[in-house]
Design a protein with these regions (language model features):
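Conserved catalytic core of the tyrosine transesterase superfamily
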Residues: 1-324
Length: 324
C-alpha cells in the first residue's frame, strides 16, 4: 500500500461521509483535518508507511503525543472518534483484521474544583442581610437560614432542598433529610442513597429558629409532603434547588460579592476551611459524604462524636448557641 493508495482511502472515506451519512461540509472539514493528522503520525513511522500497519500501540502513542502538546481531552476524544470511524470503514474495504483505535480512550477530563471563598467573605455572605430586601420579610429570613446552613454543614443544594423540619413517615412519604435543632445536627441522604449526619453551627441554628415563625404563616391546608418541608416559598411549596441557586446568586450580587456565587461554592468553602483549620481530611470527607481520597468509594468510618469535635474546633461558624 503506497502513499497514493493511502490518500485514496482517505478521500474515499470522506466521500462516504458526505454521501452516505450526509454530514455537513463543516463536519467533514473537521474529519479531514483529524485524518490528515493521523496520516502525519503514520508517515512518521517510516518511509513505507501504510494504514494497515497502524497498531493499537501506535494509536495510544499518537494520543499521548496530542496530550503532551496540551490538547484538551475533549479534542483528543474527537480525533479518536474520527480515526475509529475511518478504520471501521477501512476494514470494510480491505482485509484489515481489527480496528487499532478500539479501546483507546482520551485522558479523563480534569474537573476544576469550584473556587473557595475566603472565610471572611463566606461569613459576610451568609450573615449579611440583603440590602434590597426587608430584613424582617419571610424571604429574607428564609434566605439567611438557608445560606447559613449551606455553609455551616457543607450540604449539597439538593440535600438542602430536601430537608424536612423533622423526620416524617406517613401515607407513603418518608423524609430524605431532616434537622434536629435541639441536637444541632442535620441528617441528609446523599449520593448513592447514603445517609449522613452533620453538625450545625450556632449561627445557623439561630437563623433557622428565626425563620420558623414565618414558615408557619406560609403553611396551607392539604399541602401533602410540602407541609413537612423546612424551607418554603412564599406560596407555601417546598423550595426547589433551582430557586435556592437563584436566591443565593441575587443575594451575592446585592452584596457586591460577585455574579458567579452558587451553592456548591459554599460547600467547597466549607471543605476548604475545615481542612485548613483541622488538617483532618478523613473527617472532612465524612462530613461531605465523599468517597475516600483513593477513590475506593468506601466512606471513612468515624463516629459522630469525633466528627463533632473536629467541627467545633475547626469551623469558623461553629460557635454554639450558649457562646453568644
Amino acid at each position: 500500500m503506497d502513499a497514493a493508495a493511502n490518500q485514496s482511502y482517505l478521500n474515499g472515506y470522506l466521500d462516504s461521509l458526505a454521501g452516505q451519512r450526509q454530514l455537513s461540509a463543516h463536519t467533514i472539514s473537521n474529519y479531514a483535518r483529524d485524518l490528515r493528522e493521523l496520516r502525519a503520525f503514520t508517515q512518521a513511522l517510516g518511509e513505507q508507511w501504510e494504514f494497515a500497519a497502524v497498531s493499537h500501540f501506535h494509536i495510544r502513542k499518537f494520543a499521548a503525543q496530542l496530550h503532551a502538546r496540551g490538547l484538551s481531552p475533549s479534542s483528543i476524544a474527537r480525533k479518536l472518534s474520527a480515526w475509529r470511524g475511518f478504520f471501521e470503514w477501512l476494514a470494510q474495504q480491505t482485509a484489515l483484521a481489527s480496528n487499532p483505535v478500539e479501546g483507546v480512550k482520551a485522558p479523563k477530563r480534569v474537573k476544576p474544583l469550584p473556587k473557595a471563598m475566603a472565610a471572611d467573605d463566606a461569613i459576610h455572605l451568609v450573615a449579611s442581610g440583603n440590602p434590597l430586601a426587608d430584613a424582617g420579610s419571610s424571604m429574607a429570613l428564609c434566605n439567611q437560614a438557608m445560606f447559613e446552613l449551606l455553609y455551616s454543614s457543607g450540604l449539597r443544594v439538593s440535600e438542602l432542598a430536601g430537608l424536612d423540619l423533622r423526620y416524617t413517615r406517613q401515607d407513603g412519604y418518608e423524609s430524605a433529610g431532616w434537622i434536629d435543632l435541639d441536637g444541632a445536627e442535620v441528617t441528609v441522604t446523599g449520593k448513592g442513597s447514603k445517609k449522613r449526619s452533620v453538625p450545625v453551627g450556632g449561627p445557623a441554628i439561630r437563623a433557622i429558629a428565626a425563620w420558623l415563625p414565618q414558615r408557619e404563616t406560609l403553611l396551607k391546608a392539604d399541602q401533602g409532603e410540602h407541609a413537612a418541608a423546612l424551607f418554603l416559598t412564599e406560596r407555601g411549596s417546598r423550595m426547589s434547588a433551582r430557586v435556592i441557586q437563584l436566591r443565593l446568586k441575587h443575594h451575592a450580587q446585592a452584596l457586591g460579592i460577585g455574579s458567579n456565587v452558587h451553592p456548591h461554592m459554599l460547600r467547597h468553602s466549607f471543605a476548604s476551611h475545615m481542612l485548613q483549620g483541622s488538617g483532618d481530611l478523613r473527617a472532612v470527607q465524612e462530613l461531605l459524604g465523599h468517597a475516600s481520597i483513593a477513590a475506593t468509594q468506601v466512606y471513612t468510618s468515624l463516629d459522630f462524636q469525633r466528627l463533632a469535635q473536629v467541627y467545633d474546633a475547626a469551623h469558623p461558624r461553629a460557635k454554639k448557641i450558649s457562646d453568644k
